[in-house]
Structure formats: structure tokens, C-alpha cells
């Protein structure tokens, strides 16, 4: 059995790889450190079918002040965090006949995180993409995990604050376990929240109020159907 992990050399990526290897998977790490750029469409064209794929590569702007944010910082975060997922899914659904794809979003994909608005934007994009694309790529399953603050190098600049107030952090192994659960649950189109002290579970999104006509509720609009090719 084969699997791939993007961002496989980071803290969460290494933990996911280790979790998969314990299950007997042959795991390929796709990371800048291994010569793979998730933002490059040509790089994705070299990727072949796997049983499980974890699209985990992600970065932050490192900039809390929008007035100081450079356009290049914005573009880089969107390229890695959003393009790195979308390009991966576009390739994988062409070469996989079944199996499971899990994207690493964040709690920042489920709520507002003012400390990094662009990172939050990118993770909301992943959540929206996964929920919308999942019905279109069956029988491949597509889910996201949305971990809270995790003890990796990404939070190094904030670590003194977390330590000072005793804020609990997730361990990478906990996130990896949630990723495995999302991949093997048999569900699709779900966004699993991961928080310290709680069992991972699909987030329940509130329903959007629907339209009304002549005082009566109207159902969903008809959607065009297109058979998978």
C-alpha cells in the first residue's frame, strides 16, 4: 500500500508519515526538502496513484500587521496553502480510482484568527474547497482536518505566550491520529476539528437560511449533474 504526505518533513508531516508506516504503508514525502514544490503544476504531473494522500504543506505570513504585509507574502501563503491542495487534488483524482485524500486545514478555517488574516483566508479556502469538491470526486473520499495550535516550529514566536498562560497545545502525534481517522472513517466532505483534550470529530456547520417565496420556504436550487469522466 502506498501513501504520500506533502510537507512531510515538518512536525505534523513527520508524525503522519510515522503513523502510516506503523500501518504498513510505503510513504513518499513530498516537501521542498525532498525537492518537491507543491505550487508547481508540473511537479504534480509526476505524481502517481496512491491509496492515501495527505495534503499537509502549509506556511504562515509571520505578519500580524496587515499594514506591513507585502503582496509577495500574501501570494506565497496562498500558493502553498491553497494551490498546494487544489493542484494536488486535481492530479490525484485523475490517477486514483478510489482511496482517500485528507487536506490539513486549521481551526483558522472554521473561525476568525485576527493574528494572521491571510493564513485564515487560506484555511477557509481549503475548508470550502473540500466540502464543495467531495461530492464531485466520489468514490475517492476527500476530507480536511482542522487542528488547533500544535507544538511545531510554526508557533515558535508565540511559544512564550502559550507557556506563560498555560495554554494547551496539540502534539503532532495527536494531529496525525486525527488525520488517520479522517482518512479511514469512510466519510467524505467532512472537516474534522482537533483540539487538546477532545476527541476529533466532524465539525457541524450551521445551515444557511434559505430563500422564501410568497412566505413559504423554498428548497435548494437544482444543480446540474455531470457523470464522472
Model-derived features: where do they sit?
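Substrate-binding pocket helix/loop in short-chain dehydrogenase/reductase
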Residues: 64-66, 73-75
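Active-site helix of classical SDR
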Residues: 89, 122
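N-terminal Rossmann NAD(P)H-binding glycine-rich loop of SDR-like oxidoreductase domains
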Residues: 9, 17
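C-terminal helical subdomain
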Residues: 144, 161-210, 226-228
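Active-site-adjacent segment of SDR/Rossmann-fold oxidoreductases
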Residues: 95-96, 111, 132-141
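Residue(s) in the substrate-gating loop at a strand-loop-helix junction
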Residues: 106
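Active-site loop immediately N-terminal to the catalytic Tyr-X3-Lys motif
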Residues: 111-118
